[in-house]
Amino acid sequence: MKALALLAVLLLSGCASIYSTPPTAIHQPMSARPDMRAQAVPATGSIYQPSQARPLFEDRRARNVGDIITINLVERNTAQKSANASATRGSAITGGISLTAPNIASLANAKLNGLQADVGLDSDFSGEGAAAANNVFNGTISVTVIDVYPNGNLLVSGEKMVAINQGNEFIRFSGVINPTTVTAANTVQSTQVADARIEYRGSGFIDESNTMGWLQRFFVAIAPF
Protein backbone atom coordinates (compact mmCIF):
# COMPACT_ATOMS: atom_id res chain seq x y z
CA MET A 1 0.00 0.00 0.00
CA LYS A 2 2.83 2.38 0.86
CA ALA A 3 4.51 1.58 -2.44
CA LEU A 4 1.32 2.46 -4.33
CA ALA A 5 1.00 5.75 -2.45
CA LEU A 6 4.61 6.66 -3.25
CA LEU A 7 4.07 5.76 -6.90
CA ALA A 8 0.95 7.96 -7.02
CA VAL A 9 2.88 10.92 -5.58
CA LEU A 10 5.62 10.51 -8.19
CA LEU A 11 3.07 10.31 -11.01
CA LEU A 12 1.25 13.42 -9.79
CA SER A 13 4.51 15.35 -9.57
CA GLY A 14 5.16 14.42 -13.19
CA CYS A 15 1.81 15.94 -14.14
CA ALA A 16 2.63 19.27 -12.51
CA SER A 17 2.67 22.21 -14.86
CA ILE A 18 6.09 23.55 -15.85
CA TYR A 19 4.65 26.83 -17.09
CA SER A 20 4.44 28.53 -13.72
CA THR A 21 5.64 32.08 -13.25
CA PRO A 22 9.36 32.08 -12.38
CA PRO A 23 10.39 33.56 -9.02
CA THR A 24 11.44 37.18 -8.78
CA ALA A 25 13.67 39.29 -6.53
CA ILE A 26 11.37 42.32 -6.92
CA HIS A 27 9.02 42.45 -3.95
CA GLN A 28 6.98 45.53 -4.82
CA PRO A 29 3.86 45.52 -7.03
CA MET A 30 4.36 45.46 -10.79
CA SER A 31 1.67 48.11 -11.27
CA ALA A 32 -0.35 50.67 -9.31
CA ARG A 33 -3.63 52.50 -9.74
CA PRO A 34 -3.47 56.30 -9.94
CA ASP A 35 -4.38 58.26 -6.84
CA MET A 36 -7.86 59.72 -6.68
CA ARG A 37 -7.90 63.15 -8.25
CA ALA A 38 -8.83 66.13 -6.17
CA GLN A 39 -12.42 67.13 -6.60
CA ALA A 40 -12.69 69.57 -9.46
CA VAL A 41 -13.62 73.08 -8.44
CA PRO A 42 -16.15 75.04 -10.45
CA ALA A 43 -14.66 76.61 -13.57
CA THR A 44 -13.96 80.29 -13.09
CA GLY A 45 -12.65 81.00 -16.56
CA SER A 46 -9.03 80.63 -15.47
CA ILE A 47 -6.63 78.53 -17.55
CA TYR A 48 -5.07 77.03 -14.43
CA GLN A 49 -7.03 74.19 -12.82
CA PRO A 50 -5.74 72.99 -9.41
CA SER A 51 -7.09 69.46 -9.96
CA GLN A 52 -5.08 69.02 -13.18
CA ALA A 53 -1.92 70.99 -12.60
CA ARG A 54 0.57 70.69 -15.46
CA PRO A 55 3.32 73.13 -16.44
CA LEU A 56 2.31 75.16 -19.49
CA PHE A 57 5.71 75.00 -21.19
CA GLU A 58 6.60 71.37 -20.54
CA ASP A 59 5.84 68.10 -22.30
CA ARG A 60 3.71 65.62 -20.43
CA ARG A 61 6.00 63.51 -18.27
CA ALA A 62 5.43 60.98 -15.52
CA ARG A 63 5.31 62.54 -12.08
CA ASN A 64 2.40 60.89 -10.23
CA VAL A 65 1.51 57.40 -9.01
CA GLY A 66 0.08 55.40 -11.90
CA ASP A 67 1.92 57.34 -14.62
CA ILE A 68 3.91 55.35 -17.18
CA ILE A 69 7.57 55.77 -18.13
CA THR A 70 9.44 53.96 -20.90
CA ILE A 71 12.82 52.52 -19.88
CA ASN A 72 15.52 52.08 -22.52
CA LEU A 73 17.55 49.04 -21.45
CA VAL A 74 21.17 49.69 -22.41
CA GLU A 75 23.05 47.49 -19.96
CA ARG A 76 26.56 46.26 -20.66
CA ASN A 77 28.75 44.78 -17.93
CA THR A 78 32.17 43.18 -18.17
CA ALA A 79 34.08 41.58 -15.30
CA GLN A 80 37.24 39.51 -15.00
CA LYS A 81 38.81 37.76 -12.04
CA SER A 82 41.84 35.49 -11.62
CA ALA A 83 43.59 33.90 -8.66
CA ASN A 84 46.72 31.80 -8.19
CA ALA A 85 47.92 29.96 -5.10
CA SER A 86 50.96 27.76 -4.46
CA ALA A 87 52.28 26.15 -1.27
CA THR A 88 55.17 23.74 -0.66
CA ARG A 89 56.18 22.07 2.59
CA GLY A 90 58.85 19.46 3.28
CA SER A 91 60.46 17.83 6.32
CA ALA A 92 62.91 14.97 7.02
CA ILE A 93 63.99 13.02 10.10
CA THR A 94 67.06 10.76 10.14
CA GLY A 95 68.32 8.67 13.07
CA GLY A 96 70.84 5.85 13.64
CA ILE A 97 71.20 3.25 16.43
CA SER A 98 73.94 0.60 16.87
CA LEU A 99 72.95 -2.43 18.97
CA THR A 100 74.69 -5.70 19.93
CA ALA A 101 72.83 -8.48 21.70
CA PRO A 102 75.35 -11.08 23.00
CA ASN A 103 72.88 -12.74 25.38
CA ILE A 104 70.72 -14.05 22.57
CA ALA A 105 73.52 -15.07 20.22
CA SER A 106 71.96 -18.52 19.90
CA LEU A 107 69.12 -17.03 17.92
CA ALA A 108 69.63 -16.67 14.20
CA ASN A 109 70.27 -13.14 13.14
CA ALA A 110 69.75 -11.90 16.68
CA LYS A 111 72.68 -9.59 16.48
CA LEU A 112 71.50 -6.14 15.53
CA ASN A 113 74.14 -3.74 14.34
CA GLY A 114 73.68 -0.31 12.78
CA LEU A 115 69.90 -0.07 13.11
CA GLN A 116 68.86 3.13 11.26
CA ALA A 117 65.52 4.85 10.65
CA ASP A 118 64.68 7.53 8.08
CA VAL A 119 61.40 9.47 7.94
CA GLY A 120 60.53 12.03 5.26
CA LEU A 121 57.47 14.16 4.49
CA ASP A 122 56.82 16.28 1.44
CA SER A 123 53.65 18.23 0.62
CA ASP A 124 52.95 20.36 -2.41
CA PHE A 125 49.81 22.34 -3.37
CA SER A 126 49.09 24.45 -6.41
CA GLY A 127 45.81 26.06 -7.39
CA GLU A 128 44.65 28.39 -10.12
CA GLY A 129 41.28 29.91 -10.97
CA ALA A 130 39.88 32.39 -13.45
CA ALA A 131 36.44 33.79 -14.22
CA ALA A 132 35.12 36.19 -16.83
CA ALA A 133 31.65 37.58 -17.50
CA ASN A 134 30.29 39.73 -20.31
CA ASN A 135 26.60 40.65 -20.25
CA VAL A 136 24.67 42.75 -22.75
CA PHE A 137 20.97 43.62 -22.35
CA ASN A 138 19.21 45.89 -24.83
CA GLY A 139 15.52 46.60 -25.23
CA THR A 140 12.63 48.69 -23.92
CA ILE A 141 10.02 48.21 -21.24
CA SER A 142 7.28 50.50 -19.95
CA VAL A 143 6.94 50.73 -16.18
CA THR A 144 4.48 52.30 -13.76
CA VAL A 145 5.17 54.82 -11.02
CA ILE A 146 4.51 52.94 -7.78
CA ASP A 147 5.38 55.67 -5.29
CA VAL A 148 6.59 59.28 -5.18
CA TYR A 149 9.23 59.97 -2.54
CA PRO A 150 9.19 63.20 -0.52
CA ASN A 151 12.16 64.51 -2.53
CA GLY A 152 10.29 63.95 -5.79
CA ASN A 153 12.06 60.77 -6.94
CA LEU A 154 9.86 58.13 -8.52
CA LEU A 155 9.78 54.46 -7.54
CA VAL A 156 8.87 52.48 -10.66
CA SER A 157 8.39 48.84 -11.55
CA GLY A 158 6.94 46.89 -14.42
CA GLU A 159 6.75 43.52 -16.10
CA LYS A 160 6.54 42.31 -19.68
CA MET A 161 5.52 38.76 -20.62
CA VAL A 162 6.02 37.32 -24.09
CA ALA A 163 4.65 33.88 -25.02
CA ILE A 164 6.98 32.18 -27.50
CA ASN A 165 6.06 28.72 -28.80
CA GLN A 166 6.15 26.36 -25.81
CA GLY A 167 7.26 28.80 -23.13
CA ASN A 168 6.88 32.25 -21.63
CA GLU A 169 9.56 34.92 -21.33
CA PHE A 170 9.39 37.48 -18.50
CA ILE A 171 11.20 40.82 -18.32
CA ARG A 172 10.92 42.67 -15.02
CA PHE A 173 12.31 46.05 -14.03
CA SER A 174 12.29 48.19 -10.89
CA GLY A 175 14.25 51.17 -9.62
CA VAL A 176 14.23 54.80 -8.52
CA ILE A 177 14.16 57.57 -11.13
CA ASN A 178 15.15 61.20 -10.79
CA PRO A 179 12.42 63.15 -12.65
CA THR A 180 15.04 65.48 -14.15
CA THR A 181 16.49 62.56 -16.16
CA VAL A 182 13.18 61.88 -17.91
CA THR A 183 13.37 63.13 -21.51
CA ALA A 184 10.72 65.05 -23.41
CA ALA A 185 9.62 61.74 -24.95
CA ASN A 186 8.93 60.41 -21.43
CA THR A 187 11.83 57.96 -21.59
CA VAL A 188 14.88 57.33 -19.40
CA GLN A 189 18.04 55.26 -19.80
CA SER A 190 18.38 52.26 -17.51
CA THR A 191 21.90 53.42 -16.63
CA GLN A 192 20.34 56.52 -15.00
CA VAL A 193 18.07 54.50 -12.69
CA ALA A 194 19.15 54.03 -9.08
CA ASP A 195 18.73 50.69 -7.29
CA ALA A 196 17.85 49.11 -10.63
CA ARG A 197 16.80 45.47 -10.70
CA ILE A 198 16.52 43.89 -14.12
CA GLU A 199 15.34 40.32 -14.58
CA TYR A 200 15.02 38.18 -17.67
CA ARG A 201 13.55 34.78 -16.92
CA GLY A 202 11.63 32.10 -18.71
CA SER A 203 9.24 29.25 -17.99
CA GLY A 204 8.55 26.12 -19.98
CA PHE A 205 10.16 22.82 -20.79
CA ILE A 206 13.23 24.51 -22.33
CA ASP A 207 13.87 26.40 -19.10
CA GLU A 208 13.19 23.27 -17.05
CA SER A 209 15.74 21.32 -19.10
CA ASN A 210 18.42 23.74 -17.88
CA THR A 211 17.54 23.14 -14.22
CA MET A 212 18.95 20.31 -12.09
CA GLY A 213 16.30 17.92 -10.76
CA TRP A 214 15.50 17.80 -7.05
CA LEU A 215 16.85 14.26 -6.60
CA GLN A 216 20.10 15.13 -8.33
CA ARG A 217 20.44 18.25 -6.18
CA PHE A 218 20.02 16.05 -3.10
CA PHE A 219 22.86 13.72 -4.07
CA VAL A 220 25.09 16.62 -5.05
CA ALA A 221 24.51 18.21 -1.62
CA ILE A 222 25.56 15.09 0.30
CA ALA A 223 28.34 13.92 -2.00
CA PRO A 224 31.72 14.14 -0.18
CA PHE A 225 33.65 14.68 -3.41
From Swiss-Prot:
GO BP, one annotated term: bacterial-type flagellum-dependent cell motility
Keyword NADP: no
PROSITE patterns for this protein: PROKAR_LIPOPROTEIN
InterPro entries, alphabetized: Flag_Lring
Lipid-bearing positions (N-palmitoyl cysteine): 15
Keywords: Bacterial flagellum, Cell outer membrane, Lipoprotein, Membrane, Palmitate, Signal
Membrane topology type: Lipid-anchor
Keyword Signal: yes
Protein's cellular compartments: Cell outer membrane; Bacterial flagellum basal body
GO molecular function: cytoskeletal motor activity
GO CC, any one term: bacterial-type flagellum basal body, distal rod, L ring
Lipid-binding residues (covalent, S-diacylglycerol cysteine): 15
Signal peptide stretch: 1-14
Function statement: Assembles around the rod to form the L-ring and probably protects the motor/basal body from shearing forces during rotation.
Subunit comment: The basal body constitutes a major portion of the flagellar organelle and consists of four rings (L,P,S, and M) mounted on a central rod.
Similarity comment: family membership: Belongs to the FlgH family.
Protein name: Flagellar L-ring protein
Protein's gene: flgH
